[in-house]
């Protein structure tokens, strides 16, 4: 997302576009970046419209959708049509379990509130005297990653393999809870230390862990 947006901004300034046109290009670039990364043009379009422009005008929708579709075509041409997650064939969910879906949605909503709160307050945490140097912030994140590499290695990385494994195997409630807590905190730590990165994919993993946790608890 960031690479696509920055590339679009650079192209805009190279071509001498106006500020308004540059905003449209940045939105289109971000949409193309997400669409290419996940082979998901619709997700890229909706993300850019909701997060960057917060409106659905045709002037924004058409270039954003065009860039997302074009990026997906190019990505599939070079890397194939495999998606980020490879779920097995799923059976239809019985209607008597629909309340579980609603409960998962509510739980993810509350988790999002807590995550946003933590994200906004990471500056206060990294503002402690011990983190006065930027290197200390990065060292703390690396130390946390090292601990997790020996204790919960599934938490590290993008999380694609973890989500795939959740769909194919069953884990105990305690292990899932540990994975969720570790992924939640480590995402905040790694993003807050200032190293360039994102939390879009980690949020998908957190949502999958919440669903697996409640599925293990309720079903």
Which positions does each model-derived feature cover?
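Alpha-helical transmembrane segments and immediately membrane-proximal extracytoplasmic
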Residues: 1-219
């Amino acid at each position: 997302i960031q690479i696509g947006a920055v590339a679009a901004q650079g192209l805009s300034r190279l071509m001498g576009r106006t500020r308004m046109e540059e905003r449209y290009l940045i939105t289109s670039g971000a949409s193309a970046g997400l669409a290419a990364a996940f082979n998901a043009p619709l997700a890229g379009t909706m993300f850019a419209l909701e997060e960057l422009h917060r409106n659905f005008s045709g002037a924004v929708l058409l270039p954003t959708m065009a860039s997302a579709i074009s990026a997906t075509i190019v990505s599939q041409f070079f890397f194939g049509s495999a998606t980020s997650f490879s779920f097995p064939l799923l059976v239809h969910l019985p209607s008597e379990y629909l309340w579980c879906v609603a409960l998962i949605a509510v739980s993810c909503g509350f988790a999002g509130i807590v995550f946003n709160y933590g994200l906004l307050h990471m500056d206060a945490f990294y503002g402690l005297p011990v983190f006065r140097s930027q290197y200390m912030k990065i060292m703390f994140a690396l130390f946390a990653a090292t601990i997790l590499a020996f204790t919960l290695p599934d938490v590290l990385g993008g999380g694609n393999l973890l989500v795939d494994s959740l769909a194919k195997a069953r884990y105990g409630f305690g292990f899932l809870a540990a994975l969720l807590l570790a992924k939640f905190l480590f995402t905040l730590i790694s993003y807050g230390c200032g190293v360039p990165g994102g939390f879009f994919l980690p949020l998908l993993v957190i949502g999958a862990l919440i669903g697996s946790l409640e599925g293990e608890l309720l079903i």
